[in-house]
């Protein structure tokens, strides 16, 4: 029997591709998505995606969704307490691992691993340190469909928001902008 894992779901392309990679590798079984939703806005905390879209994504993936509601602003103590509660429920269901779509940020990885260790759980990172030009090409070539919902205006013109994440989008990116938004 395969190990059962939750996938931390930001509602973005990296989470979607992490799900694809995990399913393709066929070593563990993703049994649910885990997402933080900011209470006053009723949106995914990471990307600001509406909750209805989040729920449609989970349905399209064929996976149950665990929504961890957090306030805004959310002090770390509240965030961590609510995540511990969600992990307690997951552990009761026999889940001991959470997968993340993170690519590079060592401090975020260490934070996730340390918090999971406190509740006797582990983390996996299927996209970790993959070269982003290769990863972007694999996503587009593999049929991933995504729409850019936010951009950093210090890095990229606002006109890129609302575009499909496709070969045309990647070709139009300035050379100094990471194709995965890192």
Language-model-detected regions and their locations in the chain:
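Nucleotide-activated chemistry modules centered on ATP-dependent adenylation/adenylyltransferase
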Residues: 1-182
């Amino acid at each position: 029997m395969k190990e059962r894992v939750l996938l931390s779901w930001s509602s973005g392309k990296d989470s979607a591709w992490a799900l694809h990679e995990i399913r393709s590798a066929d070593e563990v079984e993703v049994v649910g998505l885990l997402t933080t939703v900011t209470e006053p806005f009723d949106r995914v905390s990471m990307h600001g995606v509406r909750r209805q879209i989040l729920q449609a994504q989970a349905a399209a993936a064929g996976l149950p969704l665990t929504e961890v509601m957090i306030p805004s602003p959310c002090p770390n103590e509240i965030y961590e307490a609510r995540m511990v509660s969600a992990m307690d429920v997951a552990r009761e269901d026999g889940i001991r691992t959470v997968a993340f779509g993170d690519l590079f940020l060592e401090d975020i990885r260490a934070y996730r691993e340390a918090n999971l260790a406190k509740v006797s759980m582990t983390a996996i990172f299927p996209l970790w340190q993959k070269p982003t030009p290769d990863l972007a090409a694999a996503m587009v070539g593999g049929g991933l469909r995504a729409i850019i919902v936010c951009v950093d205006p210090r890095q990229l013109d606002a006109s890129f928001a609302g575009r499909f994440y496709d070969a045309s989008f990647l070709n139009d990116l300035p050379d100094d902008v990471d194709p995965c938004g890192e």
